[in-house]
A protein has these predicted regions:
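Cation-handling catalytic/transport regions enriched in His/Asp/Glu
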Residues: 1-164
Length: 164
């Protein structure tokens, strides 16, 4: 189910609500390891403890926990925040896209994404890597980068679905 919200072990299978919590867990552990406040051999135990704290679930096997991502095993530290930055940037862009294209939702309901892809081409893709991300967001949206549009999106979407 596309809009179902529930805690799960695997980051890449997480819903929109929990995905960034998965990222937060990883970032917190990276900061501790890089800051020499946590030793690598202690990671599995700390992972499981934090996972229980954040998701209220017990990790029973490492493949559902600390070993599910390849990032750390290939030395890709500091990469996880880019996923959340992408979500936050998407929130900014989607908010502006909806303002600029009142019929956007109607197109999506019909399976037509051409309005969105045209908007992205005109406002993002044509610039390539000419601008720093924050500058590109400001240029495309007229506003500074913020998490507010993404949080509003989650609130609006899931408040309606779950009647909260």
């Amino acid at each position: 189910m596309v809009n179902k919200v529930e805690t799960g072990f695997i980051r890449t299978e997480a819903d929109e609500v929990h995905y960034n919590l998965h990222i937060m867990l990883r970032i917190e552990l990276e900061v501790e390891v890089i800051g020499k406040n946590l030793e690598v051999p202690d990671l599995p135990e700390v992972w499981n403890s934090k996972f229980k704290e954040y998701f209220d679930r017990d990790v029973e096997k490492s493949s559902d926990g600390i070993l599910q991502d390849v990032h750390w095993s290939i030395g890709a530290f500091g990469y996880f925040p880019t996923y959340t930055l992408g979500n936050l940037n998407a929130g900014c862009l989607f908010e502006k896209m909806q303002e600029d294209i009142p019929s956007l939702a109607d197109g999506f309901e019909k399976g037509d994404v051409s309005l969105a892809t045209t908007w992205l081409t005109d406002n993002i893709h044509q610039h390539g890597s000419l601008y720093e991300p924050a500058d590109l967001i400001k240029k495309a949206t007229g506003k500074a980068f913020t998490s507010e549009p993404f949080l509003n999106y989650l609130d609006e979407k899931f408040s309606d679905i779950y009647e909260i």
